[in-house]
Amino acid sequence: METALLLAKLPEAYQIFDPLVDVLPLIPLFFLLLAFVWQASVGFK
């Protein structure tokens, strides 16, 4: 249990990457949106 809590919190050295880790799960949504916009631009062929 303690190991999981230790791994869940980023070490101090990686604290600067904390905002990046918050954004990473959103990247697949951006790809989905990009695919939709691309299909809309070519007319859903």
Swiss-Prot record:
Keywords: Membrane, Photosynthesis, Photosystem II, Reaction center, Thylakoid, Transmembrane, Transmembrane helix. InterPro entries: PSII_PsbK (IPR003687), PSII_PsbK_sf (IPR037270). It is a single-pass membrane protein. It is found in: Cellular thylakoid membrane. The keyword DNA damage does not apply. Disulfide bonds: none annotated. The chain crosses the membrane at residues 24-44. Its main location: membrane. Residues 1-8 form a propeptide. The keyword Thylakoid applies. One of its GO terms (cellular component) is plasma membrane-derived thylakoid membrane. One of its GO terms (biological process) is photosynthesis. PSII is composed of 1 copy each of membrane proteins PsbA, PsbB, PsbC, PsbD, PsbE, PsbF, PsbH, PsbI, PsbJ, PsbK, PsbL, PsbM, PsbT, PsbX, PsbY, PsbZ, Psb30/Ycf12, peripheral proteins PsbO, CyanoQ (PsbQ), PsbU, PsbV and a large number of cofactors. It forms dimeric complexes. Belongs to the PsbK family. One of the components of the core complex of photosystem II (PSII). PSII is a light-driven water:plastoquinone oxidoreductase that uses light energy to abstract electrons from H(2)O, generating O(2) and a proton gradient subsequently used for ATP formation. It consists of a core antenna complex that captures photons, and an electron transfer chain that converts photonic excitation into a charge separation. This is Photosystem II reaction center protein K. It comes from Microcystis aeruginosa (strain NIES-843 / IAM M-2473). The gene is psbK.
